[in-house]
Amino acid sequence: YRIKKKDSIEEKLVRHGFEPTLENAKDQLQDIAGVRIICYFVGDVNNLVNMLKKQPDLIFIRESNYIENPKPNGYRSHHVILGVNVCCLDANEYYPVEVQLRTISMDFWAAMEHRVSYKKQYDNKEQRVAELLQYSNILEKMEKEFEKYNDHPVEM
């Protein structure tokens, strides 16, 4: 899990043109709190997303399916924003939580992309993006081959 730090929240609000207030953080940011779920198979990711959408105590806000529609650099993951009930002294309120679901290989790729993106030897951004996309495509092919071994899928 992850909870964004106060200075990071304030910086993001200012960057997007908002005053750094608690109310703006609640209303404008949907990634203050987050969790990442790592699965073996894409089929399990899809089943878990469907389960989360049907969960009666959560509010489905939106999703970004980067597995079906990868980013140009090859990033693949399924992000779901859910409203989670938070009980306060005088009221119950729903706060957005970002849930990232991906496979082990997608998580490995994302970690390597983060590491490579900060290396000075890759000044040629186009070359770096092309290489990352190539590696993402290789991992995707491997995942599809391994899917046949999914004899214990997450069931709804």
Task: Say what each PLM segment does.
Residues 1-18:
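Surface-exposed, low-hydrophobicity interaction/linker segments
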Residues 147-156:
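Eukaryotic low-complexity, non-globular regulatory regions
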Residues 26, 39-148:
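Long beta-strand-rich cores associated with HINT superfamily self-processing modules
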Residues 21-30:
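Short, flexible, solvent-exposed loop/turn segments with mixed acidic/basic and small polar residues
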Residues 32-39:
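Terminal, regulation- and interaction-focused segments at domain boundaries
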